[in-house]
Amino acid sequence: MDQGYYLSQSVEIPVGASLYIEPGVTVTCKSEVQVPVEIVVLGNLYCLGTAEKPVIFTSDTRKPADWGGIICGYNSEEVVLNHVDVAYAGATPTESSASFQNKLFKTTIDGGVPAFHFCNVNGKFVMANSFFHDNYNDQTYFTGGNGVIINNIFADSGNAADGGEAINVKAGCKLDVANNIIYNACTNAFKLSNAGNSEVIPLSEMTVYNNTIVNCGWRRSKNKKGGSVWVEKAAKPVFVNNLIYDSRFGLKQPKKDGADMEHSRLTPNYYFASTETGVAQMAKDAELGIWFDTDIKSSVAGQLNPLFKSFKQSEKMNINCEIDDVAGCSIGIRKELEFRLSGRQSCSLRRCNRFCPPLPTRSAILRHEAGEFPG
């Protein structure tokens, strides 16, 4: 019988200690508490789920911002999240919160925490085969670490007032991000930045490819600075062979302090829009947009539809809607929805596929699947 744990207060994993969570375990966080529940990882965390028996972090009322998140410390050496569901996180900490007491993520109380945060420049993490959904702020936020983010689903992140990215990256990271589905991120699927760079925090190196980005950006009602991918503060990612589908904007950067264009690789990618508004907002003359002739883009509404196997867009889709539960808003996602391609555009997508990076860090996933992790 699978085990379940009910948390009414935060759990703190000490420096040097490791917590292993076995397949099928469900951790339910109580929502009606004075100090939001958090999982603070000062040591190591290994969530070792399987496809049949994922590890689940949820809440008792199943509402966004019911609990904090998984917040890792500056000495956290290794974290593995394999076949893990993380939902309803993003609560605002208090001065009594474990993350705040350990000076992690928030040094002032001015908003919620992400569902998963990693910050050790020398640490390692793996996120694989996991499902992050209905989290009130960013799904993930990285200010350091060497990580692999592969084969995950990130759905329904953020809130209209404060935004919320699926994958938010600052300086200090070396990341390999591939084969993820990002659906309905409030602001961007990816926010890629070198904010925080210093003598001890190096510039980030990011390789982002073969990801599917669907319906992102439409809920952001304030500071509309993104809608699929935002690159700033001299970030220099490799961002290629990604599919961006019906998101509010295409690739963007600020007027000042934008991407390091000389050292980035930001094309080819595939952009589809089912509406004329979508076509206009990712066009060559779109404000703050980054344009490449080598990308594949819809030039009229509905052109180059990738034809997903079991996902069908709402006929009333309005990528500037900004409000949930009205005509034109994005439909909810089911974990079993297939975003694999079923139709004739697969050949066009393969035209983008000119990138096969080495992935030495993926060996960590293979070691875990073989029962050898950690080494």
Positions of PLM-derived features:
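Extracellular beta-rich repeat passengers
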Residues: 1-22, 27-375
